[in-house]
């Protein structure tokens, strides 16, 4: 077993090293067709006209918040917040956000999605029809609500605990278990070794409602 872990560690470190080298050597220039600006609240925006696919727009909001920012008693809250963005906002309470998106052709899980990583959380709305300007306005309102106005209803929080628990269970492959054991070796005395976004289920199952609200704020 020890020999297996040594081999796995070497393979993983080699893969990460190659990835870092590729990132360092490939600096992608900024597209001159992209409009870049910064709002008074600190939000940096990027806008680019795109004719493909024709008649559709895409919206993304990337937040520099990931699992690396969590304390030990918060492990999994960044990912939990990502899930809660689809369970009620000020402008779209309950399941209204998903229902409205589906009504205009934006499919949940395909066009409407998000992910949490160690260093960031990214939400996206794609395949947005541009024929009606009001639809684009509503998508911008959704981005606003995600950043500022989640309801974080207690019943919705409790319902989502089991959803995330099932997601965790589905991820517990042999490769994932090896990864969890290798990361602390690769990153000793660092949060990077202990901050997989899914978190730990003891926190997910038992955190107080206010803990999630405080983390959001």
Summary of predicted features, one role per range:
Residues 1-7:
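Positively charged n-region of N-terminal signal peptides that target proteins for export
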Residues 7-19:
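Bacterial N-terminal signal peptides
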Residues 23-35, 123-126, 133, 141, ...:
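Histidine-acidic residue clusters that define the catalytic metal-binding segment
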Residues 24-61:
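Mature N-terminal segment immediately following signal peptide/propeptide cleavage
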Residues 58-126, 173-174, 178, 194-200, ...:
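M16/MPP (pitrilysin/insulinase) zinc-metallopeptidase core fold and M16-derived inactive scaffolds
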Residues 91, 125-160:
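M16/insulysin-pitrilysin zinc metalloprotease superfamily fold
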Residues 94, 98-102, 150-169, 180:
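Acidic/histidine-enriched alpha-helical segments
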């Amino acid at each position: 077993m020890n020999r297996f872990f040594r081999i796995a560690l070497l393979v993983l470190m080699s893969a990460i090293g190659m990835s870092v080298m590729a990132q360092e050597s490939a600096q992608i220039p900024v597209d001159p067709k992209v409009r870049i600006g910064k709002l008074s609240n600190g939000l940096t925006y990027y806008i680019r006209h795109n004719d493909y696919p024709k008649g559709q727009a895409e919206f993304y909001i990337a937040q520099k918040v990931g699992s690396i920012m969590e304390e030990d008693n918060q492990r999994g809250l960044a990912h939990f917040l990502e899930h809660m963005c689809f369970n009620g906002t000020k402008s779209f309470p309950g399941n209204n956000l998903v229902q409205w998106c589906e009504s205009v052709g934006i499919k949940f899980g395909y066009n409407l999605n998000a992910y949490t990583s160690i260093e960031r959380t990214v939400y996206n709305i794609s395949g947005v029809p541009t024929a009606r300007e009001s639809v684009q306005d509503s998508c911008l309102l959704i981005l606003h609500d995600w950043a500022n106005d989640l309801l974080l209803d207690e019943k919705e929080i409790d319902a989502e605990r089991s959803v995330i628990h099932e997601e965790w269970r589905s991820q517990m492959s042999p490769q994932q278990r090896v990864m969890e054991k290798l990361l602390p070796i690769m990153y000793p005395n660092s949060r990077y070794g202990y901050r997989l976004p899914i978190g730990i289920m003891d926190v997910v199952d038992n955190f107080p409602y206010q803990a999630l609200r405080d983390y959001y704020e």
